[in-house]
Amino acid sequence: MTTRIDLGRLDGAGAEHEAAPGPGPGPGAGAGRESADPRRVRVSRRAAEALGRRLESPMPWQVARRTGPDRTLDGSMRPAPVPPHDPDDTTDPWEELGGLGLVDASGRLFPELPGALDVLARPETAVDLDLVVRRPTTGAAPVAAPGDGAGPGGSTDVQLRAWHRRRAGRVTAVATAGAQVEIGWFDDRSWAAELARVAAVTSALAPTPPARDLTLPHELMLGVGVARRTDAPRLTEELLRRHLPHMRVPEGADAREQVQLLHSGVVGRLRAVVSGQGDDGRRKVGWVSWLLFSDGWRTLRPHVDSGVSQVGVHHVEPSALGREVARLVAGVAS
């Protein structure tokens, strides 16, 4: 079972996302206007859902449960994760929200909240992010790849889900990890930095990574992954025999070894799915796929070369996520 984690801590080395403010901004702050600076508040699942009911803006996991299962990063199917709640916690959600300054004694909400949750419910563009990072643990339970739960060599997977919704220059983001829910809202000029914040993780695990730039046939990349999960070495050999001539690796690198390292060295995965309505009224979808290694992220860029479906595997920094998402946002809106 996948371990879900504190929003502020994403790996065994103690790497942290930027901390959200403790107490909320208070009903008097920013009244009558929307702040250009990102605002974030962390609440329980109960409190987040109470806000959603009050404003008729359901939380993303509630929508996902109604629309069916979600595809995980490793291609398997499972229901979209629902943030857990402590059954022994009897705190009234409105008392919790009041303590954060998000509702006053008369029941009036912090002025920016209705607009933020309206963007969440009625966006022009949606970005769903799924992040899985492998970290060390004391136990050992061999599993193939991040996204499956327990991992090889005494490791386990930690997961963060985030939903970003944009409309008319404003973005509302909801993220879940464990029992915590973070709700944020900001001007879309801050969006690239907020996306980079999601990808700003590392892992304390340090398997040998592949080269920073590779190109290989799509069938080879997927097929070797299947062969490894099903313990089919003959299939691996046949795929290598057929596709190695089409690989491009740095000078001096061994292509066969690079294929193996591309799978054995993975310590995390990130997927961003972008959707929106185009000028022709049709719903359009695009996606970004990244793999995390001990020396950083690689983006996967599919393309066709001389009639062969290929995947470029290239090193990127977390800041590149904003650029890749922006390109897709422009595409789905056209």
Describe the residue ranges of each PLM region.
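Intrinsically disordered, low-complexity coil segments
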Residues: 67-82, 133-159, 277-284
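Extended, charged low-complexity segments
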Residues: 251-334
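Accessory beta->alpha helical hairpin/"wing" motif in late/C-terminal subdomains of nucleic-acid enzymes
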Residues: 90, 100, 104-193
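Intrinsic-disorder-associated interaction segments
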Residues: 40-44, 106, 213, 225-229, ...
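Surface-exposed beta-loop interaction hotspot
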Residues: 171-241
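Negatively charged, low-complexity tracts enriched in Asp/Glu with abundant Ser/Thr
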Residues: 96, 100-127, 237-264
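Surface-exposed polar/charged interaction patches
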Residues: 54-58, 100, 123, 201, ...
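Short, amphipathic alpha-helical interface elements at domain boundaries
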Residues: 2-22, 26-98, 102-108, 115-121
